[in-house]
């Protein structure tokens, strides 16, 4: 076996510039400088989508490595100091603890990591989204790895024809379950069609057993017990040679699907694929955005990124997303633009409702009954 490489993508919202729209250049410079000093990494890139900083790192220490997670945590702490100096909005909001405990999972930042033996050619895509939640990856990952109308390789590539194994997390019960596709396709859809609770964590090739994709599944609100911003997930997808081609991995985003998040994390909106220079959400703090950064790995070195969604081929998707956004905005505070009440539990909505609870009185349904015939006659 050859040497195994670990690709870690760890993200956090450290403070918005301006509001929730983007990241101040000084924060990116701080992250770059801190990672450059580390002896742990083979290579790294610092990116952002909206107001989230994404640390893309390669190393040889495997997933859940305490030293790598501590490095990312320290980067975010350094950036938080700069954010507070600049009085950026929500400085350090994704950091839910004051002390590092060996792993950033459960402490606020989102994490997607995979370890694999680098192939002869290793194309990967790092997807990063803003103003939405981890379930936003469910439909795209399903289409990439299970839908032959999206991925023709499932039909004609003998290395893909056997299908893929999906690992799904229940974010409420903290449980996981695996499905073997295509034979358990309908069973999978029972769960991933509810992306607020069930999220695709990882995908594995049934032909090779190798990992093909992994996503961050951290839910900030569930960890903090209050609304502290949307989760803004990341996802890593390996491509080609028995896995979806790059174009097959990008194709699901050509037709924007609806995701939860947007303004105050309380609305449904289209996930708009954008170039890196268009990733600052502004209209109603949105619509939700997704970027796609393509890399070739070479001995763990990151060659790239290629800004995939900057292509004019996605102009139509952006136009469609804007049209969907305009229609949904016309509904204002009404569902289905606003999230249903059960999904508003961790927003500020309960505080407003609590103020009014004493104004509710019981309804006597006997007063609502139809009058009997004799009562009508008496009148």
Swiss-Prot record:
Q: What's the short name of a Pfam family annotated to this entry? A: FBPase_3
Protein origin, superkingdom: Bacteria
In which organism is this protein found? Moorella thermoacetica (strain ATCC 39073 / JCM 9320)
- Which residues does Mg(2+) 1 bind? 13, 20, 51, 93
Q: What is this protein called?
A: Fructose-1,6-bisphosphate aldolase/phosphatase
Looking up PANTHER family in the UniProt record yields:
FRUCTOSE-1,6-BISPHOSPHATE ALDOLASE/PHOSPHATASE, FRUCTOSE-1,6-BISPHOSPHATE ALDOLASE_PHOSPHATASE
Residues reported in the UniProt entry to bind Mg(2+) 4:
231
Q: What does the entry note on its domains?
A: Consists of a single catalytic domain, but remodels its active-site architecture via a large structural change to exhibit dual activities.
Classification of source organism: Bacteria, Bacillati, Bacillota, Clostridia, Moorellales
EC number(s) on file: 3.1.3.11, 4.1.2.13
């Amino acid at each position: 076996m050859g040497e195994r490489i670990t690709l870690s993508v760890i993200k956090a919202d450290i403070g918005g510039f301006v509001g929730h729209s983007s990241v101040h250049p000084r924060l990116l410079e701080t992250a770059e400088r801190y990672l450059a000093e580390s002896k742990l990494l083979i290579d790294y890139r610092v990116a952002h989508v909206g107001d989230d900083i994404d640390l893309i790192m390669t190393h040889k220490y495997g997933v859940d490595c305490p030293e790598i997670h501590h490095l990312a945590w320290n980067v975010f702490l350094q950036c938080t100091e700069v954010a507070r100096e600049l009085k950026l909005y929500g400085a350090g909001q994704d950091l839910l603890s004051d002390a590092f405990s060996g792993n950033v999972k459960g402490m606020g930042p989102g994490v997607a990591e995979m370890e694999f033996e680098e192939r002869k050619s290793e194309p990967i895509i790092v997807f990063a989204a803003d103003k939405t939640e981890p379930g936003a990856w469910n439909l795209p990952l399903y289409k990439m790895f299970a839908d032959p109308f999206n991925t023709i390789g499932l039909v004609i590539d003998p290395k893909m024809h056997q299908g893929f194994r999906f690992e799904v997390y229940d974010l409420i019960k903290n449980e996981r379950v695996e499905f073997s596709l295509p034979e358990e396709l309908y069973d999978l859809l029972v769960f991933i069609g509810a992306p607020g609770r069930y999220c695709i964590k990882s995908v594995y090739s049934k032909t090779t057993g190798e990992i093909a994709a992994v996503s961050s599944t951290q839910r900030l609100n569930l960890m903090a017990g209050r609304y502290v911003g949307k989760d803004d997930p990341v996802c890593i997808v390996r491509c080609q040679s028995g896995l979806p081609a790059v174009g097959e991995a990008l194709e699901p985003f050509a037709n924007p699907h609806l995701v939860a998040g947007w303004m105050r994390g309380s609305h449904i909106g289209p996930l708009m694929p954008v170039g890196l220079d268009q990733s600052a959400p502004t209209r109603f703090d949105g619509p939700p955005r997704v970027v796609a950064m393509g890399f070739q790995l070479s001995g763990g070195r990151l060659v790239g990124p290629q800004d995939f969604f900057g292509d004019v081929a996605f102009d139509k998707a952006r136009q469609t997303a804007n049209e969907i956004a305009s229609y949904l905005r016309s509904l204002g505070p009404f569902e289905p633009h606003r999230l249903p009440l059960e999904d508003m539990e961790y927003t500020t909505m309960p505080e407003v409702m609590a103020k009014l609870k004493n104004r509710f009185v019981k309804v006597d349904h006997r007063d609502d009954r139809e009058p009997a015939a004799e009562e009508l006659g008496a009148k």
